[in-house]
Amino acid sequence: MSVRTVAIAAGGTGGHVYPGLAVADALRERGHRVVWLGTRAGLEGRVVPAAGLDAEWLEIGGMRGKGLATIAALPWRLGRAVAVAGAALRRQRPDVVLGMGGYVAGPVGLAARLAGRPLIIHEQNARAGMTNRFLARLGHRVLTGFPDALGARSEWVGNPIRTRIHRLESPQERYARREGAPRVLVLGGSQGARALNRYVPQALSAIGGGQPQVLHQAGELTLEEARTEYGRAGLDGAEVVPFIEDMAGAYAWADLVVARSGALTVAELAAAGVPAVLVPLPWAVDDHQTANAEWLCAAGAARRLLQPDLEQGALGPVLAELLGDRRRLAEMGEAARGVARPDATDRVATICEEVAHG
């Protein structure tokens, strides 16, 4: 198969950027050239150069906002963003454009269609955002991380994630060897989650039966805040870190995860086969995190608590119930793995090749 150039448009948060990087790695392993279209201000401005990818940095701002001035300026801002994206596509001449989300993907998708470049859309969340609902009408192929997120034309391929997570032992094998205190992995994301910092230590300290082992990823911004909360709760043995480099190892270690329900987190939980208590971000756009969590709960792999539930003390009883029964946790882990899409990265890469070759 001849070498093709694939442009990946994604930016802003890890939920868009890291799946894009997974696909980029797969395409490069197959000998193709990949160029990234994003903004320097987003997460991609740091991690894309570190991955050794060529990039076009676009001066594009978000399109959502409130107020008459913002609404009145929208046509001009969108037109300028599409023009900037179009210039980048003329320079790079990609054979196919893959939109992976974030506000950069909208203008790039429009520019791709105006330039006659084949367009593939990938929607990571169970509830599609406004941009992808529009771009789905223009895409040559429409891919989703969850079933039925973009209607009848869409193909459920799953969310591309880090390969090592798929290679973990089965939940039954992992839990069969477990002894001692339960192990809780708390994921607050790169920005931290203040609600988890506050309420998880309180809940763990109240369940009794000895202290659990805790690994809490709190992000740089709320690191000291989280450490303080564990100290107040008397859980001095909790390990609170800004970032976890080896996520596969962390999932393999954990009995239970407490986390927000971003698309990437939910996909990794399914692939790893780890049960979870999910607390959707209350102000997530289109409330997509609630939809993500409900999908994993429907499979019997997770429990969902809303943030007000944490404030009312509901987390402690749920943790006590789950952490006291490793057999049940193993069953939930198997249920999680049962809905995983382990071939998502390769499938998206293959679809890029199919579209690029016409």
From Swiss-Prot:
What is the reaction catalyzed? di-trans,octa-cis-undecaprenyl diphospho-N-acetyl-alpha-D-muramoyl-L-alanyl-D-glutamyl-meso-2,6-diaminopimeloyl-D-alanyl-D-alanine + UDP-N-acetyl-alpha-D-glucosamine = di-trans,octa-cis-undecaprenyl diphospho-[N-acetyl-alpha-D-glucosaminyl-(1->4)]-N-acetyl-alpha-D-muramoyl-L-alanyl-D-glutamyl-meso-2,6-diaminopimeloyl-D-alanyl-D-alanine + UDP + H(+)
Coarsely, its chief localization is membrane
Q: Binding residues for UDP-N-acetyl-alpha-D-glucosamine, per the UniProt record?
A: 13-15, 125, 162, 190, 244, 263-268, 289
Q: What is its EC number?
A: 2.4.1.227
Q: Name one GO molecular function term.
A: UDP-N-acetyl-D-glucosamine:N-acetylmuramoyl-L-alanyl-D-glutamyl-meso-2,6-diaminopimelyl-D-alanyl-D-alanine-diphosphoundecaprenol 4-beta-N-acetylglucosaminlytransferase activity
Q: Does the keyword Transport belong to this entry?
A: no
Top-rank taxon of the source lineage equals Bacteria
Q: Where in the cell is it found?
A: Cell inner membrane
Pathway assigned to this chain's UniProt record? Cell wall biogenesis; peptidoglycan biosynthesis
For this UniProt record, the keywords arranged alphabetically read as follows: Cell cycle, Cell division, Cell inner membrane, Cell membrane, Cell shape, Cell wall biogenesis/degradation, Glycosyltransferase, Membrane, Peptidoglycan synthesis, Transferase
Q: Which GO terms describe its biological process?
A: carbohydrate metabolic process; cell division; cell wall organization; lipid glycosylation; peptidoglycan biosynthetic process; regulation of cell shape
Matching entries from PANTHER family are given as: GLYCOSYLTRANSFERASE, UDP-N-ACETYLGLUCOSAMINE--N-ACETYLMURAMYL-(PENTAPEPTIDE) PYROPHOSPHORYL-UNDECAPRENOL N-ACETYLGLUCOSAMINE TRANSFERASE 1
Which family, according to UniProt? Belongs to the glycosyltransferase 28 family. MurG subfamily.
The molecule here is called UDP-N-acetylglucosamine--N-acetylmuramyl-(pentapeptide) pyrophosphoryl-undecaprenol N-acetylglucosamine transferase
Write the gene name.
murG
